[in-house]
A protein has these predicted regions:
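Conserved catalytic cysteine-centered active-site region
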Residues: 1-38, 48, 83-86, 99-102, ...
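Flexible glycine-/small-residue-enriched beta->alpha junction loops
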Residues: 37-110
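Conserved beta-ketoacyl condensing-enzyme motif
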Residues: 1-68, 144-156, 249-270
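Condensing-enzyme catalytic core mediating Claisen C-C bond formation in acyl metabolism
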Residues: 82-94, 167-232, 236, 240-245, ...
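Active-site pocket-lining segment
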Residues: 106-109, 150, 218-294
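Beta-strand segments within the central parallel beta-sheet cores of soluble alpha/beta enzyme folds
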Residues: 8-14, 38-42, 121-128, 145-149, ...
Length: 341
């Protein structure tokens, strides 16, 4: 990448909003006079999340490693039981909130019940995500850098289904609440690998390196919420941005709300209607180039991807302001406002 060796790097972490956190961290460092140009972004390889041994198995392996003679090793080996080798799925552990004990899909099921969001509405939203992503392939191709896997270039998102429909999605079975649930593999975000890189800097830094800025960061907010209803996180985050800078969603020409689950986004839209003037958002205004249901949700990268997509939409459409928001596993929300330069 041509970054000089003396330039340090650091990792930030805010679950689903980690990519956005990297952007706002750069902004904070610039405000503190710690630099004027930062390479930021996020990456996630969800296909390579490991399996784990149960906690008790690790202790038995440690005992085996400490054994000093053959008899000690035999005793350590004899302590193992078949259950010790039953793997724990790392992805499932990572997507389970330790406070509520709920896996993320169960939080979406909770919202679907509380807001009366039926299976048909979720599947219709999911099918629209694929349809919009397919229609926008030409617009987004310039923001994709090809990667090579086994010598083959991948230059387009491979999760988009050109034949997705409400009828096909209706054939899928619920995966969290298997008896009465409505959340399926088709109306939630895809498990995906992905990475995003952006430059965040001052106008002077952009001029110095000969680049034209895509836009300006004008506000951002992170807010907490009930972990069992983490999907509603965008609502308090947007409200905090209003309190800080007077910005309300209806001012945005472009709006991106991450599609962790169709039920979650629809619940956010329903809750925003209760927030007062300027907060109601029509469904057709959000995620006009598709969302994570079609494109995937590589957790560490999505926040930065949404910002990049929103900036490009502003420049393609001639809009002035964009609002980007995500729910965050563990009970948070993130909202970030951009302005076209």
């Amino acid at each position: 990448a041509g970054v000089p060796i003396p330039v340090p790097a650091a990792t930030v972490h805010r679950n689903c909003a980690s990519g956005m956190e990297s952007i706002t961290t750069a902004h904070q460092r610039m405000a503190a006079g710690k630099g004027d140009l930062f390479l930021v972004g996020g990456t996630e390889s969800m296909s390579r999340v490991p399996l784990f041994y149960p906690h008790g198995t690790n202790a038995k392996f440690n005992a085996l490693g400490r054994a000093k003679d053959m008899m000690g090793k035999l005793r350590a080996v004899a302590a193992f039981r078949p259950i010790d080798f039953k793997p724990e799925i790392g992805l499932q552990l990572g997507l389970t909130d330790p406070v509520s004990g709920m896996i993320m899909g169960d939080t979406a099921e909770l919202l679907s019940r509380e807001y009366g969001i039926d299976r048909g509405a979720q599947d219709a939203f999911a099918a629209a995500s694929h349809r919009k992503a397919l229609a926008a392939r030409e617009q987004v191709k310039d923001e994709i850098t090809p990667v090579f896997v086994d010598g083959k270039a991948i230059s387009a998102d491979n999760g988009i289904r050109d034949d997705s429909s409400v009828e096909k999605l209706a054939e899928l079975k619920p995966i969290f609440d298997r008896q009465t649930g409505t959340v399926t593999a088709g109306n939630r975000s895809q498990i995906t690998d992905g990475a995003v890189a952006l430059l965040v800097g001052s106008e002077e830094a952009a001029k110095r390196i000969g680049l034209e800025p895509l836009g300006r960061l004008i506000s951002y907010a992170y807010a907490g919420c009930d972990p069992s209803r983490m999907g509603l996180g965008p609502v308090p985050a947007m409200e905090l941005a209003r309190q800080q800078d007077g910005l309300v969603p209806e001012e945005a020409d472009v709006i991106e709300i991450n599609e962790a689950f169709a039920a979650q986004v629809l619940a956010v839209l329903a809750e925003l209607k209760k927030q007062g003037p300027g907060f109601a958002i029509p469904e057709e205004k959000i995620n006009r180039w598709g969302g994570s249901i079609a494109l995937g949700h590589p957790v560490g990268a999505t926040g930065a991807r949404l910002v990049l997509t929103a900036l490009n939409q502003l420049n393609v459409t001639g809009g002035r302001k964009a609002l980007v928001s995500l729910c965050v596993g563990g009970g948070q929300g993130a909202a970030l406002w951009l302005e076209r330069t």
